[in-house]
Amino acid sequence: MDKIVLEGCRFYGYHGAFKEEQTLGQIFLVDLELSVDLQAASLSDQLTDTVHYGMVFDSVRQLVEGEKFILIERLAGAICEQLFNEFPPIEAIKVAIKKENPPIAGHYKAVGIELERQR
C-alpha cells in the first residue's frame, strides 16, 4: 500500500494525567503514516487525486491544540477518527505521539505511544 508520511509535527497542547500537564501544557510530537492508494496521483499530477497533507496537518493541529485529553492514547484515537471522517481515501493510519518533557523523574529522550487503525 502507498503511504503519505508526516513526521515530527510539533504542537502545543494540554493533554496528560498530571495537573501540571493540563494547566501548563507542553509540546507534543506527532508522526503520521497514512495508507492511501496513490496510483491516480502518480499518473495525473493532480492534487485532487491524493490526500492533501497540508489539510491533514491542519486537521491534526486543530485537534491537538484545541481539545484536552487525559491520555495520549485517546488523543491518538481521536486523530484517527477525525482523519477517517475528513479524508475518505485514507484506508489505514499509524499515529505516534511523544512527549519530550512529561513531569516524571528520570532520564529519557521521550515517552509516547503508537497506535494503528484500519477503516
Curated annotation (Swiss-Prot):
Question: What's the EC number here?
Answer: 4.1.2.25
EC category name:
lyase
What does the record list as GO biological process? folic acid biosynthetic process; tetrahydrofolate biosynthetic process
- State the source organism's domain of life: Bacteria
What does UniProt give as GO cellular component? cytoplasm
List, from the UniProt record, the residues annotated as the active site of this protein.
Answer: K99
Which keywords does the record carry?
Folate biosynthesis, Lyase
- Chemical reaction(s) catalysed: 7,8-dihydroneopterin = 6-hydroxymethyl-7,8-dihydropterin + glycolaldehyde
Q: Which SUPFAM superfamilies match?
A: Tetrahydrobiopterin biosynthesis enzymes-like (SSF55620)
Please name the GO terms that the record assigns under molecular function.
dihydroneopterin aldolase activity
Q: What is this protein called?
A: Dihydroneopterin aldolase
The organism of origin for this protein? Streptococcus pyogenes serotype M1
